[in-house]
Amino acid sequence: MASVSPSSLLLLFFALLSPLLPLTSALVFREYIGSQFNDVKFSDVPINPDVDFHFILAFAIDYTSGSSPTPTNGNFKPFWDTNNLSPSQVAAVKRTHSNVKVSLSLGGDSVGGKNVFFSPSSVSSWVENAVSSLTRIIKQYHLDGIDIDYEHFKGDPNTFAECIGQLVTRLKKNEVVSFVSIAPFDDAQVQSHYQALWEKYGHQIDYVNFQFYAYSARTSVEQFLKYFEEQSSNYHGGKVLVSFSTDSSGGLKPDNGFFRACSILKKQGKLHGIFVWSADDSLMSNNVFRYEMQAQSMLASVNSRDRAMYWSLL
């Protein structure tokens, strides 16, 4: 019987093990979709196979529908364009693109022209209702994750931290979702709530979708990098994703140096991913998803380099 060298056994071990090992350095591209009911579909958005791609359905809200929406204490329902972004369409895009995952975002800025408030009756009742209603929606729509985007609050920071923290902990424990993100921006009230959540439950949060487009439209590359460092400090240890919008809001736009800033962060090893608000706006713009393709191409180049380094070590 021929002998097998230790080095051959080691190579065989790594070859068998490698499909099970995640590429923890893989960068993620994320895009919000569905809030504006302008018939945008998953298939409209270009998807690079070499990035981890997340669609984020905007939004699920714990409010009644109708002309005068009111809070429902954690009883969520879909408020995105469910005709074009249905359960079957979620399943289809995930079947077609193995690198795609789909999550839903909670809250958002407004519904029916009025602010959406985080407004729990109590921590326990809100959490119970939220776990039940969101589990049902997530399973119905074949979703993978959840994003927290409340922007207005009637509860104090500690109540917000406990409600959201307990919710995401239970959803992960029950294997309903595999990842969680939060979407704060630079506003004193918003930051006080999200930083309280981060302090208590940051270990449950996988991505920080920081809304850098909420800064001034006059933001320079240097200012953008300064803001990134500030928010990386505020959410210490978190994967803070950089962002731009394709609507008329502010921040550092792609034409004004966004990708230059990303290149600097990439060289520093600080670029964790990019997210965009939103596919709805991109569909209607003159640049129809041009910047999404550019962002994914940048991220894919980093991922390809890291994969090459990974295999060279085997």
Swiss-Prot record:
Keywords: Carbohydrate metabolism, Chitin degradation, Chitin-binding, Glycosidase, Hydrolase, Polysaccharide degradation, Signal. It is an enzyme of class 3 (hydrolase). This is Chitinase 1. Able to cleave glycolchitin. Belongs to the glycosyl hydrolase 18 family. Chitinase class II subfamily. GO terms for molecular function: chitin binding; endochitinase activity. SUPFAM superfamilies: (Trans)glycosidases.
